[in-house]
Amino acid sequence: MNDLALALGLGIPLSLLVGVIIGYFISIKIFKKQIRDNPPITENQIKAMYAKMGRKLSETQVKEIMRSIKNQK
């Protein structure tokens, strides 16, 4: 009976700790993938930002800016 209580007393917290650590790394990986696939700034936002500064960007320049944002890691 004592062995079972000791095993449960050590096994449950250890399992919870391992689960929390694994969950943390999985959530970080998913978050980074979502940010990479859906950057927090859009092409329209870039165009609007440059329009406020008095510049009109071509599509090539907008794509280049988006590519440079995605390549920053």
Curated annotation (Swiss-Prot):
Q: What is this protein called?
A: UPF0154 protein MG335.1 homolog
The entry's localization annotation reads: Membrane
Short name of any one Pfam family annotated for the protein:
UPF0154
Q: What is the superkingdom listed in this entry's lineage?
A: Bacteria
One cellular component (GO) term of this entry: membrane
Q: How does it sit in the membrane?
A: Single-pass membrane protein
Kindly report the protein's main subcellular placement as a broad class. membrane
So what family is this one in? Belongs to the UPF0154 family.
| Annotated transmembrane regions | 6-26
Q: Could you tell me the keywords of this UniProt record?
A: Membrane, Transmembrane, Transmembrane helix
Which HAMAP family is this protein grouped with?
UPF0154
Q: Which organism is it from?
A: Mycoplasma pneumoniae (strain ATCC 29342 / M129 / Subtype 1) (Mycoplasmoides pneumoniae)
